[in-house]
């Protein structure tokens, strides 16, 4: 039986999962201590040269001269050779163009990126303080975990490391306490800080997803990836839900990648049954440049209209690394500034009378924009990976794991995103982001990129 394209990709993913270099969360315990792996107590045998025929009878690497045993090995080797030969013939019959299209269309992790690992770190509690509009805080994460399929699609990103949840002591003396059994934390900077309530939907969904989060409110969300969509799963659909108590959830947004587009173009809608630009629930779109290194988020306005002009909601920029140094992914997010009544400044790149967010940032005109960066993961010698503390919200390493902070207050986490299973990701956000902005930022991390990081 011939080898299918899906089997080829599955084999590639399994191979990648065996290799180190992902970012992991620092809040995960290791399955066994590293010291046990360094034990020298057992005898190792590895000689496979021609003299093993006369080796010690106690050597497990010795080849016995028993004819029947030799015949069994020979038959097994011949059968294996025939199977390999048949597989090669099957591979040659696969349409190369279909294979290239399928592999390039999948969202995968790049070879040279390091995933971020997740490790929970003990953090000292901090006295409750009022939320400040420009305050930003974060935790720690690491890079040594398996690649999922969209990680594999990003294999062309040069020099990106995965992030793992980490379990190391916090480098910040005033960091917030890790969230307790009730799902809340005791610090204002960490996810679920003291005096910070978990947000709920207020009013209509289409209005709520565009409204900036109030100060002092945290929204805990979950993104699920549905691969059962069009074109053999090459264009999955992403669903954003707000998590509630007792496992309940509220649908907020859905997003899908447009098929016939020169660059990556995602449609975002609050109607899960109609993810099109003409739908009543259309909320906006995410569009990338040709390299997939820069993304712009727009609302549902019309760029040709003067009454309802299309507004810029965010710009996401992934740093390029043409030298290919291996390390965590670096990203910059530029948002419209906030007014005194906590509303976004209206910026439209479609208006010839004003500059868009990206143009303002390039000219270093920061009066009406806010610049965020991903929290830099910390290298952990014990796990040999980059780690960040996601406070229990992220459980698997991935290049896509990240936390967004502001340079003026790197303890205040504006948004965090990370993988918990093959097709499930957590996404938490707070002021000044809205659900639409946060979801679009998360979608940009799924997309394949060339020469990034």
From Swiss-Prot:
InterPro entries: Tubby-like_C, Tubby_C, Tubby_C_CS. It is a peripheral membrane protein. GO terms for cellular component: ciliary membrane; cytoplasm; nucleus; rhabdomere. Residues 74-90, 179-188 have a biased composition (Low complexity). GO terms for biological process: protein localization to cilium. The keyword ATP-binding does not apply. The modification Phosphoserine is found at residue 142. Residues 62-73, 125-144 have a biased composition (Polar residues). It is found in: Cytoplasm; Nucleus; Cell projection, Cilium membrane; Cell projection, Rhabdomere. Pfam families: Tub. Its main location: cytoplasm. Belongs to the TUB family. PANTHER family: PROTEIN KING TUBBY, TUBBY-RELATED. This is Protein king tubby. The gene is king-tubby.
């Amino acid at each position: 039986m011939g080898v299918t394209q899906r089997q080829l990709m599955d084999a590639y993913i399994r191979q990648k999962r065996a290799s180190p270099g992902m970012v992991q969360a620092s809040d995960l315990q290791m399955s066994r201590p590293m010291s046990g792996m360094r034990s020298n107590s057992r005898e190792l045998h590895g000689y496979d040269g021609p003299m093993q025929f006369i080796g010690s009878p106690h050597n497990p690497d010795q080849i016995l001269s028993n004819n029947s045993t030799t015949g069994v090995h020979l038959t097994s080797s011949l059968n294996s050779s025939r199977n390999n030969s048949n597989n090669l013939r099957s591979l040659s019959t696969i349409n190369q163009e279909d294979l290239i299209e399928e592999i390039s269309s999948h969202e995968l992790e790049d070879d040279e990126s390091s995933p971020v690992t997740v490790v929970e770190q003990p953090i000292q509690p901090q006295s409750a303080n009022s939320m400040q509009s420009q305050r930003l805080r974060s935790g720690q994460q690491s890079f040594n975990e398996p690649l999922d399929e969209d990680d594999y699609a990003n294999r062309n990103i040069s020099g990106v490391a995965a992030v793992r949840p980490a379990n190391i002591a916090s480098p910040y003396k005033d960091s917030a306490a890790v969230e307790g059994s009730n799902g809340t934390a005791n610090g204002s900077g960490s996810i679920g800080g003291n005096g910070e309530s978990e947000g709920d939907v207020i009013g209509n969904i289409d209005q709520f997803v565009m409204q900036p989060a109030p100060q002092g409110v945290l929204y805990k969300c979950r993104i699920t990836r549905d691969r059962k969509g069009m074109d053999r799963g090459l264009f999955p659909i992403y669903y954003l839900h707000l998590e509630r108590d007792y496992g309940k959830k509220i649908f907020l947004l859905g997003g899908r990648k447009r098929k016939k587009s020169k660059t990556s173009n995602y449609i975002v809608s609050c109607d899960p049954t109609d993810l099109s630009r003409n739908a009543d629930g259309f909320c906006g779109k995410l569009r990338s440049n040709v390299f997939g290194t820069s993304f712009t988020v727009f609302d549902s306005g019309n760029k040709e209209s003067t009454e309802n002009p299309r507004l810029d909601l965010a710009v996401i920029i992934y740093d390029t690394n043409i030298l290919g140094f291996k390390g965590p992914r670096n990203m910059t997010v530029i948002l419209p500034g906030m007014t005194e009544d906590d509303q976004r400044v209206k910026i439209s790149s479609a208006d010839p009378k004003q500059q868009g967010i990206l143009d303002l940032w390039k000219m270093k005109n920061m009066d009406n924009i806010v610049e965020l960066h991903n929290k830099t993961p910390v290298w952990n010698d014990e796990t040999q990976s980059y780690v960040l503390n996601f406070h229990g919200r992220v459980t698997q390493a991935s290049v896509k794991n990240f936390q967004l902070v502001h340079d003026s207050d790197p303890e205040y986490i504006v948004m965090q995103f990370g993988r918990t299973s093959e097709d499930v990701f957590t996404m938490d956000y707070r002021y000044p982001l809205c659900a639409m902005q946060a979801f679009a930022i998360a979608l940009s991390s799924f997309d394949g990129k060339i020469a990034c990081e």
